[in-house]
Amino acid sequence: MNNKHQALPEHELLTHKSFIRNLNLFDWAFALLIAIGAFIAQTQAGLHMDIYEMVILWASAGIAVFLGWFFKPMRWFIPLGVCLAYLAVDLYGGDIKHADGFLLKYLLSSQSAIMWQCAMIFAALFAYACGSLLAAHKKSQTNTLLGIGTAFGWISALAGFTGLLVRWHESYLLLGDAGHIPVSNLYEVFILFLVISSLMYWYYETRFTVQRLGVFVYTLMAGIVCFVLWYSLARNAQQIQPLIPALQSWWMKIHVPANFIGYGAFCMAAMLGVAQLMVIRSTEKGKASRLPDSATIEEIMYKAIAVGFLFFTIATILGALWAKAAWGGYWSWDPKEVWALVVWLNYATWLHLRLVVGWRGKILAWWAIIGLFITAFAFVGVNMFLSGLHSYGGL
């Protein structure tokens, strides 16, 4: 292999040599483990699943395998989260009354796991902030505190992932056949958002070695945690409720997660935009910035927006198909649909200006930041201030 290929990140080598041939024994063992897990899940819950849910189960297993092959740390993250959730299921023993047991009450019930997720996000932010200050003082790119911040971020994602899986099981314990995937209200989807954001940042931090950007990403995530806590207290949103008729569809299981991969990527890009503006400002003043260089930050921001745009596009298409099944038409110019289109056009334009026109620097950073407010209004603001077919998601 020539030097050009050696310099490429691992996943970019896919275009130069066979992806399958580069898989090792651990990769195939991971794939087998996921397949066995999916088979056990279908065996135990198959009587309660229709054909669409079985397709979603095996598609999810395939996605999990690809994630583990593409980003190696996922090979332990996914099995560990599933094992912790399965332990919680076993501790429940089919009866929600067992929630008072020590492990469930303080660690593994959905509420306990999610509270640990929230606590670890604040801990990660504190560690990243202290680590960034220490790195600036010692003029280094990494240190123990930044590593601790990364570890806390991993734990937060694992706790949130486990909490969502356990909450799914708890919904069946509480509601019987009316149990459902935990993406039915703002509380649940924000927990999903936090998990996705943590994992996405984890990937980019690992690939680009940019631990000092963690303070920007986790500042936004900590703000969202504050909102989740307020929302839980104000609306008792942590309580599991039956699905309203409009959400009783298998489309929800794929539309909502795809949407929140997009939201997570867009929000991360906005915080990277803030970091890039700080670097540009320091450069313009002739000062050395302690953050990664502007080009590196912009490259991560671009990749985040590209991934977010892809999944947001998929989610929008899935939403149109769901609308056809639910309301008889693919598009009705409902406020939520209109603002989804605004979000899509905003990031389509951003990508066009960067890839085709060749724009770089400050203007794209500002655009990404403004995009956060557009995305936030499309998700939360529309529900608060406008009415329409999607009003069931209101605050």
Residue spans for each PLM region:
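Juxtamembrane inter-helical linkers in multi-pass membrane proteins
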Residues: 283-295
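Hydrophobic cores of alpha-helical transmembrane segments in multi-pass integral membrane proteins
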Residues: 2-100, 109-240, 247, 251-281, ...
